[in-house]
Amino acid sequence: MMNLQGKKITVHDMTLRDGMHPKRHLMTLDQMKSIASGLDAAGVPLIEVTHGDGLGGSSVNYGFPAHSDEEYLGAVIPLMKQAKVSALLLPGIGTVDHLLMAKDLGVHTVRVATHCTEADVSEQHISKARSLEMDTVGFLMMAHMASPEKLVSQALLMEGYGANCIYVTDSAGYMLPDDVTVRLRAVRGALKPETELGFHGHHNLAMGVANSIAAVDAGANRIDAAAAGLGAGAGNTPMEVFIAVCDRMGIATGVDVFRIQDVAEDLVVPIMDHIIRVDRDSLTLGYAGVYSSFLLFAKRAEKKYGVPAREILVELGRRGMVGGQEDMIEDTAMTLARERAAAAHKAAA
């Protein structure tokens, strides 16, 4: 029987960063400010604000945002009464200059994200963030693709570069609670006791809350979630549900159970371009182990090439595509469309 009574955790909000994916990075400054202020008032201690793909994500490959990272951060940070603001940075997209800009604007936490087997590309960014005395997080994405032993080796690299917290990230929403437990226990056992451990979930198999609780039980003390689940795929772990479950279990989050519901219902749901839910395409992300932010790219390719998004996503999973290969989605759709046309031609002959 799990007993987490009295355990303290830090909840990290994703609404204004992972939530940029389903908004196609087009949140307005007013939307950002009102949601961030609501989260702050609800007691959320850490709020991530950047382009969905992190600092410097504005590009043809990832999508152009309504405003620059500087504008979003500059609008939100001065409004915060108790919450700190974090920024995501993917080496190869974000640079040390972006990191310095974020620090100058008052960003407290930087999360340096790599594919779960490529931690070595994070050294420059992690060591720089630590030298700036920032709260520095190593963020291992698509963690279902690596064994617990491999994740341990990658986590130790990031810790060695200076990260004071390591995240195991279920970018595809593929993991089940046992997958989370075995990975987080292994990483927790290998890290220094003072190094924190985090978990980032997606709700593609509706496991976001269960996986996050499993993570806490395995030793995680930072958990990502989003108000109304606003995030890529079927969204992140829905914050208001997670907070209610924590409250029931006696896990201390410092977040007000009812205020966070109001933020989700009154501020986040009304700005959704589509309802964030487990539909056949987002379910396929979780089932096939595909990067959650590929969802809208696959839906777009379906319209363009007439190949169902689900087929595209299954093929991407078969090919083992990872974050950063967004350009290959179109390529995959074209290949499948050609194969379909050839099969139809053969059948007609």
Curated annotation (Swiss-Prot):
<keyword id="KW-0456">Lyase</keyword>
<comment type="similarity">
    <text>Belongs to the 4-hydroxy-2-oxovalerate aldolase family.</text>
</comment>
<feature type="domain" description="Pyruvate carboxyltransferase">
    <location>
        <begin position="9"/>
        <end position="261"/>
    </location>
</feature>
<feature type="binding site">
    <location>
        <position position="202"/>
    </location>
    <ligand>
        <name>Mn(2+)</name>
    </ligand>
</feature>
<feature type="binding site">
    <location>
        <position position="171"/>
    </location>
    <ligand>
        <name>substrate</name>
    </ligand>
</feature>
<dbReference type="Pfam" id="PF07836">
    <property type="entry name" value="DmpG_comm"/>
</dbReference>
<keyword id="KW-0058">Aromatic hydrocarbons catabolism</keyword>
<feature type="binding site">
    <location>
        <position position="18"/>
    </location>
    <ligand>
        <name>Mn(2+)</name>
    </ligand>
</feature>
<feature type="binding site">
    <location>
        <position position="200"/>
    </location>
    <ligand>
        <name>Mn(2+)</name>
    </ligand>
</feature>
<dbReference type="GO" id="GO:0009056">
    <property type="term" value="P:catabolic process"/>
</dbReference>
<feature type="binding site">
    <location>
        <position position="291"/>
    </location>
    <ligand>
        <name>substrate</name>
    </ligand>
</feature>
<feature type="site" description="Transition state stabilizer">
    <location>
        <position position="17"/>
    </location>
</feature>
<feature type="active site" description="Proton acceptor">
    <location>
        <position position="21"/>
    </location>
</feature>
<keyword id="KW-0479">Metal-binding</keyword>
<dbReference type="InterPro" id="IPR017629">
    <property type="entry name" value="4OH_2_O-val_aldolase"/>
</dbReference>
<dbReference type="InterPro" id="IPR000891">
    <property type="entry name" value="PYR_CT"/>
</dbReference>
<dbReference type="InterPro" id="IPR035685">
    <property type="entry name" value="DRE_TIM_HOA"/>
</dbReference>
<dbReference type="InterPro" id="IPR013785">
    <property type="entry name" value="Aldolase_TIM"/>
</dbReference>
<feature type="binding site">
    <location>
        <begin position="17"/>
        <end position="18"/>
    </location>
    <ligand>
        <name>substrate</name>
    </ligand>
</feature>
<dbReference type="GO" id="GO:0009098">
    <property type="term" value="P:L-leucine biosynthetic process"/>
</dbReference>
<dbReference type="GO" id="GO:0003852">
    <property type="term" value="F:2-isopropylmalate synthase activity"/>
</dbReference>
<dbReference type="GO" id="GO:0030145">
    <property type="term" value="F:manganese ion binding"/>
</dbReference>
<dbReference type="Pfam" id="PF00682">
    <property type="entry name" value="HMGL-like"/>
</dbReference>
<feature type="binding site">
    <location>
        <position position="200"/>
    </location>
    <ligand>
        <name>substrate</name>
    </ligand>
</feature>
<protein>
    <recommendedName>
        <fullName>4-hydroxy-2-oxovalerate aldolase 1</fullName>
        <ecNumber>4.1.3.39</ecNumber>
    </recommendedName>
</protein>
<dbReference type="InterPro" id="IPR050073">
    <property type="entry name" value="2-IPM_HCS-like"/>
</dbReference>
<keyword id="KW-0464">Manganese</keyword>
<dbReference type="GO" id="GO:0008701">
    <property type="term" value="F:4-hydroxy-2-oxovalerate aldolase activity"/>
</dbReference>
<dbReference type="InterPro" id="IPR012425">
    <property type="entry name" value="DmpG_comm"/>
</dbReference>
